[in-house]
C-alpha cells in the first residue's frame, strides 16, 4: 500500500512534461507533453513515451493542466499506444488541445512527405513515420471529460482532482489531487503545471494552491527576473518605432496560443493610444487564427478588464483596423516580398518549424529588420541560437547571415519568474508542506529556484530526477 510520484519528462529540462502518480495499483498521468529541441533527439525521446517499463494501457486516467505542446503534444500517441482512460481538462484546454494536436499531426504528415521525397532524390532508404495522425487525434478527443474550475471530481477509486486557475494560458490549471491508498494513507498533491503571472492581459491571475502536502513546481525561470508589464509595453513601443523608422520589418516568432493573442492585445492598445504608427500588422499562422477564435468563445477565462471590453463596451480586443490575418499560402509568401514598415507575428514560437522559418530566411539578412524574441527558447532550437547572438544560422538546409537586429522582451513570458513564484507561495501553509519537487527547468534554473525557496523558508526541496520514484505515503 503506497502513494508515489515519478517524473517521466520535464525533469532537469523544460519540455516533455509527464508526471506519474501511483496509488497502490492505480496510475494517474499528469500531462503528456512532447519533448522539443534538436529534432532527432526529441523524436527519439517522444517515441519512448513512458519508457520501457510502463505501458500506455496501464494508465488509468490523464489529467491535463493546459494545452501547450510540451504538456499535451503526445496525448494522441498515448491513445494510439493503448491508453483508453478519461482525459480530464477544462473546456478551454480541450478546445485548444484539439487545435495543437491536430496541427502537430498535419506538420508530421507534411514532414514525412517532404523527407520521403528528399530521400528518394538521393536514392536513400526512408522509414521515418509520424508519431500519430488525424485519426489518432480524433480518438484521443473522444476521451476528454471537461471539468470546470473549483469542481472536485473523482477520477479513480480514492483519487479526486480539483482544478484551480494557474493564470498561465487560457484554460490553464493547477491540479490539486487528493489520493488515499488502501491502508488509509492520505496525501494531497499540488501540481502547478505551468505557474502564470499576475497582471497579464486577457486571463485571470494565478489562484492560491493551498491545503496541500506535496508540491510539484514549475521552475522555468528560477534564475531570472522579468520586466514589468508596463516596461514591456514601453519596450514594445520602442522596438516598433525604431524598426518603422528604418522602414524595416518587425518579425516576431510567437506561439500561436496565448502569446499571439497577448501581442495582438498589446499592439491594439499601443495603436489606439497613438504610441505606434499606423502600419500593417500581420498574423501569419493558421493555428493562431483558429486559436484567436477559441479565445473569443471562452469569456469564463477572462480577467475583469477583458470581460468588460467584450460585454460592457462590445469591443473585440483581438481585432482592430491595422490587424490582418493571412489566410492562404499566397498571403504568407506575399509578406516576404512586401516592403516595410510592417509587423509579422508568426509561429512556431521557437522557430523550429512553420511559416516563421520562411520569414526569417527572407528577413535575417537585412539590417533594417528586427527579430523580436518574446518567449522561452529551448536549448538546441533556432530561436535559442538567435537569442544567444549567432551570426549565422542554418534554416532547413541552407545557411543565413544574421544582420537583422535581435531584441528580446521577456515580460511577455507566461511563466512566473523566481520572485513571482516566491510571492505566490506566500499563500501556501508552509508548515503543512512536507516536500516540494522542482520540475520544468534547466539545471541552472532549478538550482537557483531551490536556493530562493530555501531562503523563503521552505523545507525539503527536491530537484526531481527523470525516472526516480519518490514514495510520499
Predicted regions and their residues:
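Hard-cation-handling environments
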Residues: 239-380, 447
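Short alpha-helical
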Residues: 70, 95, 170, 258, ...
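Core dinuclear metal-dependent hydrolase active-site scaffold
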Residues: 1-57, 139-204, 330-337, 343, ...
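Cap/insert and terminal regions of metallo-dependent hydrolase folds
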Residues: 174, 197-284, 370-375, 393-458
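Pre-active-site segment of Zn-dependent metallo-hydrolases
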Residues: 11-13, 23-85, 89-144, 195-205, ...
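Active-site neighborhood of phospho(di)ester-bond hydrolases with catalytic His/Asp-centered motifs
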Residues: 30-33, 59-68, 75, 87-90, ...
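Metallo-beta-lactamase
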Residues: 104-169, 299-339
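Short active-site oxyanion
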Residues: 60-61, 83-86, 249, 278-280, ...
Amino acid at each position: 500500500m503506497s502513494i508515489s510520484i515519478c517524473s517521466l519528462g520535464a525533469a532537469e529540462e523544460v519540455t516533455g512534461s509527464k508526471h506519474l502518480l501511483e496509488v497502490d495499483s492505480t496510475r494517474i498521468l499528469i500531462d503528456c507533453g512532447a519533448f522539443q529541441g534538436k529534432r532527432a533527439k526529441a523524436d527519439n525521446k517522444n517515441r519512448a513515451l513512458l519508457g520501457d517499463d510502463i505501458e500506455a494501457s496501464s494508465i488509468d486516467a490523464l489529467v491535463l493542466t493546459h494545452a501547450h505542446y510540451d504538456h499535451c503534444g503526445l496525448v494522441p500517441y498515448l491513445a494510439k499506444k493503448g491508453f483508453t482512460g478519461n482525459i480530464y481538462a477544462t473546456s478551454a484546454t480541450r478546445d485548444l488541445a484539439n487545435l495543437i494536436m491536430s496541427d502537430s499531426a498535419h506538420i508530421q504528415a507534411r514532414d514525412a512527405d517532404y523527407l520521403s521525397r528528399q530521400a528518394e532524390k538521393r536514392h536513400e532508404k526512408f522509414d521515418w513515420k509520424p508519431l500519430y495522425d488525424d485519426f489518432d487525434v480524433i480518438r484521443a478527443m473522444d476521451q476528454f471529460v471537461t471539468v470546470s474550475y473549483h469542481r472536485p471530481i473523482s477520477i479513480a477509486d480514492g483519487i479526486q482532482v480539483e482544478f484551480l486557475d494557474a493564470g498561465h494560458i487560457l484554460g490553464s490549471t493547477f491540479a490539486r489531487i487528493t489520493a488515499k491508498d488502501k491502508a488509509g494513507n492520505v496525501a494531497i498533491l499540488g501540481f502547478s503545471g505551468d505557474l502564470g503571472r499576475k497582471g497579464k492581459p486577457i486571463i485571470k491571475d494565478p489562484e492560491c494552491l493551498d491545503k496541500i502536502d506535496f508540491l510539484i513546481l514549475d521552475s522555468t525561470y528560477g534564475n531570472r527576473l522579468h520586466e514589468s508589464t508596463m516596461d514591456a509595453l514601453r519596450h514594445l513601443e520602442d522596438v516598433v518605432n525604431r524598426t518603422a523608422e528604418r522602414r524595416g520589418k518587425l518579425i516576431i516568432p510567437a506561439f500561436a496560443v496565448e502569446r499571439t493573442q497577448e501581442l495582438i492585445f498589446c499592439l491594439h492598445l499601443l495603436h489606439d493610444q497613438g504610441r505606434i504608427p499606423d502600419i500593417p500588422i500581420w498574423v501569419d499562422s493558421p493555428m493562431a487564427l483558429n486559436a484567436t477564435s477559441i479565445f473569443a468563445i471562452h469569456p469564463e477565462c477572462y480577467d475583469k478588464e477583458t470581460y468588460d471590453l467584450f460585454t460592457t463596451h462590445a469591443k473585440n480586443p483581438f481585432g482592430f483596423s491595422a490587424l490582418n490575418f493571412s489566410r492562404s499560402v499566397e498571403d504568407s509568401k506575399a509578406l516576404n516580398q512586401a516592403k516595410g514598415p510592417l509587423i509579422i507575428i508568426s509561429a512556431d514560437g521557437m522557430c523550429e518549424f512553420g511559416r516563421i522559418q520562411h520569414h526569417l530566411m527572407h528577413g535575417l539578412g537585412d539590417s533594417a529588420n528586427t527579430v523580436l524574441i518574446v518567449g522561452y527558447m529551448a536549448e538546441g532550437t533556432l530561436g535559442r541560437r538567435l537569442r544567444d547572438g549567432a551570426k549565422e544560422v542554418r534554416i532547413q538546409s541552407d545557411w543565413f547571415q544574421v544582420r537583422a537586429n535581435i531584441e528580446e522582451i521577456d515580460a511577455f513570458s507566461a511563466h512566473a519568474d523566481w520572485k513571482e513564484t516566491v510571492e505566490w507561495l506566500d499563500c501556501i501553509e508552509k508548515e503543512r508542506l512536507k516536500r516540494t519537487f522542482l520540475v520544468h527547468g534547466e539545471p541552472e534554473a532549478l538550482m537557483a529556484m531551490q536556493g530562493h525557496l530555501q531562503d523563503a523558508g521552505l523545507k525539503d526541496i527536491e530537484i526531481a530526477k527523470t525516472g526516480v520514484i519518490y514514495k510520499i505515503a
